[in-house]
């Protein structure tokens, strides 16, 4: 009886000790995470004298900015613990390395670059895709990176700024084969969340998660993605992305994916989260008209492969953060 009693008391003491330890340690972990704002940098691609891709009725730079501002406004309105920083908030030209520099100087938790896709020679395609840093696995992926990186040609000193990088030369992209990104796993996961929302919330064709050598992602020292909202070269998609409904719905999809990522991030660090992801019924905006199912493909195996590669790659050397102060237009 004495043995059983002492063992019972021992269990009580153990529980009390564990509770005390939790009270001492857990709140401090939670408060340390919530002591500072979660910082997200939203990058509207192109701008100013760089129009980006040009469609029949619009320019890419304006679509990108419109959606970027809508995403930022959704976050500001609903997340008082998030600091939103834009690389540009109006029609100005911002050098490619400066965009990443803004994010690095702000010690951002996420970098989201928003773009609009295009195909040459009057070819058409539909759907949204999300990209992470890596070696392009196909000629088509390489062409997307070349097009986005070619904006450095608007900079007079681009050869010096980007160490001789030629955005139109396949040889310049060999560097991405040997480069490792310690944020790859988080970036691929965020990209997967984006694609899920583009398909489920926005009702757009899911073109999947891809990798390519984007300079703006290479220079950012945090989980980073580049979104292609749709194809400005496809008249139907161009009209959709220029409509209030289309831009608003795409922004809502990006916002919901951001909330899901933030919630998972908090749960992983502290076991608790203040972030609430609203259900479809709780939101005012109605989904956009669904695209044909034939436009969608099963991209789950591809995304799982990228995640597996991210987990098996060794941690990379941290990317260097530029030292100039933040000056946001």
Regions found by a protein language model. Give the residues of each.
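Short linear Ser/Thr-Pro motifs
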Residues: 4-6, 113, 233
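Catalytic-core regions of hydrolytic enzymes
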Residues: 34-165, 180-184, 188-192, 248, ...
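Pro/Ala/Gly-rich low-complexity, hydrophilic intrinsically disordered segments
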Residues: 256-329
């Amino acid at each position: 009886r004495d043995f059983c009693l002492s063992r019972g008391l021992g269990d009580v003491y153990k529980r009390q000790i564990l509770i005390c330890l939790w009270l001492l340690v857990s709140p401090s972990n939670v408060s340390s995470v919530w002591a500072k704002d979660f910082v997200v940098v939203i990058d509207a691609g192109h701008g100013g004298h760089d129009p980006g891709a040009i469609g029949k009725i619009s320019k890419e730079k304006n679509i990108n900015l419109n959606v970027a501002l809508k995403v930022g406004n959704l976050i500001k309105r609903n997340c008082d613990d998030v600091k939103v920083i834009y690389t540009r908030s109006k029609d100005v030209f911002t050098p490619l390395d400066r965009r990443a520099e803004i994010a690095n100087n702000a010690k951002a938790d996420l970098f989201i670059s928003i773009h609009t896709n295009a195909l040459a020679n009057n070819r058409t395609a539909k759907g949204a895709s999300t990209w992470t840093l890596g070696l392009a696995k196909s000629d088509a992926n390489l062409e997307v990176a070349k097009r986005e990186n070619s904006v450095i040609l608007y900079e007079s000193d681009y050869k010096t700024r980007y160490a001789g990088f030629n955005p139109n030369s396949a040889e310049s992209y060999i560097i991405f084969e040997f480069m490792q990104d310690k944020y790859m796993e988080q970036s691929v996961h965020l990209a997967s969340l984006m694609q899920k929302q583009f398909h489920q919330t926005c009702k757009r064709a899911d073109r999947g998660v891809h990798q390519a050598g984007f300079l703006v992602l290479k220079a950012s020292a945090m989980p980073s993605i580049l979104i292609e909202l749709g194809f400005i070269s496809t008249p139907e998609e161009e009209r959709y992305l220029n409509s209030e409904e289309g831009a608003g719905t795409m922004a809502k999809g990006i916002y919901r994916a951001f909330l899901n990522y933030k919630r998972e991030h908090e749960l992983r660090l502290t076991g608790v989260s203040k972030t609430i992801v609203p259900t479809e019924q709780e939101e005012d905006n109605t989904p956009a008209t669904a695209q044909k199912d034939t436009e969608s493909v099963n991209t789950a195996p591809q995304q799982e492969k990228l995640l597996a590669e991210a987990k098996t790659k060794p941690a990379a050397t941290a990317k260097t953060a530029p030292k100039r102060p933040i000056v946001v237009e």
